[in-house]
């Protein structure tokens, strides 16, 4: 009887892990960059990964970025 109980417990644990994996894979989806940009629209434009707290936009100015609210932004199209 103890062997049967051990096998049943092992089966239930494995089945639980499989079901957890199936449910987790269906709900976990990373949105692509386009969706993230559309969902998090900033009225200033797109951040250029440079701040302009003490020094104005230097490297990203070549890409068309300008300083607004102490962050370098590129105007939206």
Curated annotation (Swiss-Prot):
Keyword Signal part of the UniProt annotation: yes
Pfam family, one: Cyclotide
Tissue: Expressed in fruit and pedicel but not in root, leaf and stem (at protein level).
Annotated S-S bridges: 48-65, 52-67, 57-72
Cross-link Cyclopeptide (Gly-Asn) per UniProt, renumbered positions: 45-75
Post-translation changes: This is a cyclic peptide.
Signal peptide stretch: 1-24
A Gene Ontology biological process term: defense response
Alphabetized UniProt keyword annotations: Disulfide bond, Knottin, Plant defense, Signal
Similarity comment text for this entry: Belongs to the cyclotide family. Bracelet subfamily.
Biological role stated in the UniProt entry: Probably participates in a plant defense mechanism.
Protein name according to UniProt: Chassatide C13
Native organism: Chassalia chartacea
């Amino acid at each position: 009887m103890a062997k049967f109980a051990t096998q049943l417990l092992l089966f239930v644990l494995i089945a639980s892990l499989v079901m957890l994996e199936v449910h987790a894979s269906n709900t976990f989806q990373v949105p692509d960059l386009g969706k993230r940009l559309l969902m998090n629209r900033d009225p200033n434009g797109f951040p250029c990964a440079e701040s302009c707290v003490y020094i104005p936009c230097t490297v990203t100015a070549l890409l068309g970025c300008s300083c607004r609210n102490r962050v370098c932004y590129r105007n939206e199209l």
